Regions:
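Glycine-centered flexibility motif
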Residues: 24, 86, 112-114, 155, ...
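Short beta-strand segments
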Residues: 67, 153-159, 203-205
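A charged N-terminal "starter" segment
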Residues: 1-146, 150-152, 194, 198
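Active-site loop/helix belt of alpha/beta enzymes
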Residues: 2-3, 8, 160-231
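Short, basic, helix/turn surface patches
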Residues: 115-122, 157-165
Length: 231
């Protein structure tokens, strides 16, 4: 009896003549071209195909954004920028790569806790959308906007009061370092209105590492219900 495979077959990287291939090229030949190992190799066609498959599975009105924390390599970002509707960054370094890709500032968002004043200042100056992680971050952002003479663009990252069931990484359903607790959001929204900042919407993320359709549908329903309740 043959041993059960430990992972799903890598159909995007087929084996030809007992050699793994990427982008139709054998790894041995790639290594010879590059002249050294180890190295990173990416298949643009595979990325294009996966984004296309995702678009075909979603309603047309849904926008797809690429989170650069997945892979901020400039060549990868440049290719993805031509496939998706926007980019999400988590540092000034990623922001520079995103802007260099030609993506419009209006289609770039900045998420993540612990943003320093240097990061907030750079994001406001660039004109991108900042996902607020706390009421204190909003106050710092307002002061920076006044200093630069630029009206900040903001979204509110909400820590939901529900969780994505069977999730490998839970980002909701209790105290978390990400986002503002749902019950505190109304006060933050009032302060945004008073400050004159441009409100762009909500960032609601309940978890990841979950491919169960029933859990995802339940979480999406709860997400829309929460957004309607807060709006």
């Amino acid at each position: 009896m043959s041993e059960k495979p430990r992972h799903a077959p890598l159909v995007q990287f087929p084996v030809v003549d007992d050699e793994l291939t990427i982008g139709g090229l054998k790894l041995r030949h790639l290594a010879a071209q590059i002249g050294q190992t180890p190295f990173y190799a990416y298949d643009r066609e595979a990325m294009t195909r996966r984004v296309r498959e995702l678009r075909e599975a979603l309603p047309e009105r849904i926008s797809i954004h690429y989170a650069m924390k997945a892979n901020p390599m400039p060549a990868v970002v440049d290719h993805m920028a031509g496939l998706v509707d926007g980019l999400d960054v988590a540092s000034l370094g990623e922001l520079r790569v995103a802007l260099d890709s030609g993506t419009a500032a209006a289609e770039i968002s900045f998420a993540g806790p612990g943003k320093g004043d240097t990061e907030l200042r750079g994001a406001v100056a660039a004109g991108i959308t900042l996902n607020l992680e706390s009421a204190g971050e909003l106050e710092r952002l307002v002061r920076i906007g006044e200093d630069l003479g630029i009206t900040p663009r903001v979204a509110v990252r909400v820590n939901p009061d529900f969780e994505l069931k069977s999730s490998g990484m839970k980002m909701s359903g209790g105290p978390k370092p990400f986002g503002i607790d749902a019950e505190q959001v109304p006060a933050v929204l009032r302060r945004i209105g008073e400050s004159g900042a441009h409100f762009r919407g909500f960032h609601i993320f309940s978890g990841s590492q979950n491919l169960r359709p029933d859990s995802l549908i339940e979480a999406q329903d709860a997400t829309f219900e929460l957004a309607y309740r807060l709006a």
